[in-house]
């Protein structure tokens, strides 16, 4: 099953990424996505009865840092949570994957390496039971960006049984 929790209907101030310098490289954080993932993890922990392996993954080191910090603030009873970047997660699998897309801005072409097919493949093929995507669906649903796979992914989710889109 696939679930997309879209941030598109939040204000730009809330949903837009923040840019950081990470050892001379640009990196991005998105606190709205962090907060949504925190609520989702708490919800999963309260609903699940069997110990479940969960991973929270993102393409950005700065986002990984704020997600790890948040996860450390909780002691979950029923979920075992790992946080990592998509690149570091290659080869691993978990029952549930939460994927933070991070990118959302006034630059409608600014999706960076989110359009990398290899990264999308890793992010979307590691969940045994449930993939939860958290991000600005309207921003990523842009056919004009060459190589952008998100419009196809969004179409698949909207047309497939067992998949759903959640909006504010």
Tell me the role of every PLM-derived stretch.
Residues 13-15, 65-66, 92-94, 106-110, ...:
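Switch/connector loops and helix/strand junctions flanking conserved nucleotide-binding motifs
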Residues 34-39, 61, 65, 69, ...:
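Feature representing long, continuous alpha-helical segments
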Residues 9-10, 61-63, 88, 103-104, ...:
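Short, glycine-/Ser/Thr-/acidic-enriched flexible segments
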Residues 52-55, 72-86:
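Conserved RecA-like helicase motor-core motifs
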Residues 84, 88-104, 122, 130-134:
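A short beta-strand element within the Helicase C-terminal
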